[in-house]
Amino acid sequence: METPSETSFPKGNFSSENPQVGGLTQSSTISNGYHEPFVVEPIASSHTHTIILLHGRGSNGPKFVLFPSTKWIFPTAKKRRAVLFKRMPINQWFDIYDINNQTYREHLQVDGLQETTAYLHGLIEQEIKNGIPVERIVVGGLSQGCAASLYAMLCYNKRLGGYVGMCGWLPFAKYMEDCLEASQNKDDTEDDDIFGGSDDEESTTFEKEEELDDTQATVAKNPITEAIGFLKDNISFPRSPKKEKIDVLETPMFLGHGVLDEKVLFRLGEQARDVLKGLGCRITWKAYDDLGHWYKIPDEIDHIRDFISDSLELEATS
């Protein structure tokens, strides 16, 4: 069981007397229940990129500096009542009863995922308004922050600069698998022409219109479109206009997971990886044999640094 304060990044030196230390801004409560994020302003004079990372369940915002011209944003989840902990309010992006058996009481996740997705999209849009191109914005998170940010990213309509997830999972992955598997089963039988068909080479105008309708229906029922559509429907977000290409799936992604993780089982990380591959995503996957529920130091930090450097063509500090 993941207790309510185990999955955080390293903490900065924050106190009420010391609201800003080394470019890190302390959070304050705002009206919608969220706190202002901890923000690490760029060390360099120019602000060229932004990275937004979500903490794990029961934790709060961190300190994590690698790239001098990059602004780091560490949001803190609002307090939500956790059914698993006798409805005790804890910082969590969404409620969940059993991480390793997500189909049990899965409805608990929906409201939080809806709010968190809207919140993260708002942070992204604010950075775009601040002049940062969307292709220079990276999102991600640790543990439940990985799960929430992954779900939110897949519901976004634009390609991002990158995604970084550590020891997390994909909420409602089983339904995504079902969408993709249903299409595979259809592909296995669609070549069987049980009605024989016609040998006529000419098509009537009606037949051509019917073929066009079939093509449009294929786009509408594309398994990838349907899988992403399910995620949006699940949280009452509008579906994107029907088209063959879903821009956000072009986002390069990094996923890392400890093989010995007992809080978020390794197989859940593998499941997320496989679903994302099924969606056509570009995945950098790292498994850490001797790691539990955390991130690997220095290996995983180095891997993330290299991934961000390659994806955004950024030079990292040593």
PLM regions: where:
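Serine-hydrolase catalytic machinery in alpha/beta-hydrolase-like enzymes
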Residues: 4-24, 29-136
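Alpha/beta-hydrolase-fold catalytic nucleophile elbow
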Residues: 75-76, 164-167, 256
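Conserved beta-strand scaffold positions in the cores of enzyme catalytic domains, especially
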Residues: 72-74, 163, 285-287
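The feature captures the conserved acid-bearing segment of alpha/beta-hydrolase catalytic domains
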Residues: 42-45, 168-316
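Conserved alpha/beta-hydrolase "nucleophile elbow" surrounding the catalytic nucleophile
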Residues: 55-57, 137-143, 258
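Primarily recognizes the serine-hydrolase "nucleophile elbow" in alpha/beta-hydrolase
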Residues: 128-192
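A generic structural signal for alpha->beta connector loops
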Residues: 67-69, 136, 160, 250, ...
